[in-house]
Amino acid sequence: MGFLTDWLTDWLKSLLIEGILGNLSGLFDTVNARVGEIAGEVGTTPAAWNAGVFSLIRQISETVILPIAGLVLTYVAVYELIQMLIDRNNLHDIDTWMFFKWIFKTAAAILILSNTFNIVNAIFDVSQSVIASSAGVIQGSTDISPDMLADLEATLETMGLGSLLGLWLQSIFIGFTMTALNIVIFVLVYGRMLEIYMLTSLAPIPVATLSNREMGSMGQNYLKSLFAIGFQGLLILLCVGIYAVLIQGIATGGDPIGAIWGAVGYTVLLCFMLFKTGTISKSIFGAH
């Protein structure tokens, strides 16, 4: 009878150990996969992310927003001319070079306005290039191999049946946290891209104010916002890369209970920091 009990206990222990290791290895595989997927999502330019949506945004911008921006630019140019004349002793000191200067500034403003989409795409091309370069470094340094679970398996074999059962239930809970993490990442990444499209659609209006010293703050802040949301992708990738390194430390720690709850804590921390990336990026570039 004792032999049968020992055999049944060993069988249950091996079954639970396989289940725990399977759940944890699935977690680590998910982490590796998410780093690669996020690198692809946040490193994609608006034109490449969804060509149909980008074409729609561009058409709306050029047919609806651009005429309004033309009126704004006309107002800015006239205001600039009047201000320039008044500043010269109320029209008493007028030089012909002033008009050449005004013509040059207006021509430059028209050129910039007519190439608004090229400027916007160039900004996102720069951020995409930086993200693509960083993705190779981050993903290459955070890969979690199955060999890292060997020490953890040895620790599990020394534990009792009750402890293993508790760990198995906890490891299932980890799967739900990863599902929640995937939802958060999906909302953040896709929400960021929709924000980019909305910013892009209204681009001509703030760009039309760039030539004026007093009103140019609108256009300057708009460009800062573009850089901020572009490089937010790098911060998102960096957060996931740090998370992967922390999870890697859990995998090699050899403490199964710590691995379970450490993963939960790191997942909650990652979700919090992902929502902070936008604020951090805007503070870096001075956008508001």
Regions found by a protein language model. Name each.
Residues M1, L8, L12-N23, D95-I112, ...:
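Alpha-helical transmembrane segments and their helix-start/interface "positive-inside/aromatic belt" motifs
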Residues M1-V72:
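Binding/recognition "hotspot" determinant
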Residues L16, I20, T106-L202, I236, ...:
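Non-cytosolic segments of integral membrane proteins
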Residues A33-I65, L85, N89, A109, ...:
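Internal transmembrane helix-loop-helix hairpins in multi-pass membrane proteins, together
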Residues F54-L66, W97, K101-F104, E157, ...:
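Alpha-helical membrane-interface segments at transmembrane helix boundaries
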Residues G70-I86, I236-A251:
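Juxtamembrane "helix exit" motif at the C-terminal ends of alpha-helical transmembrane segments
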Residues V72-A108, L202-G216:
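Hydrophobic transmembrane alpha-helix segments characteristic of membrane transport
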Residues V207-K224, A251-G253, K282-G286:
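Alpha-helical transmembrane segments
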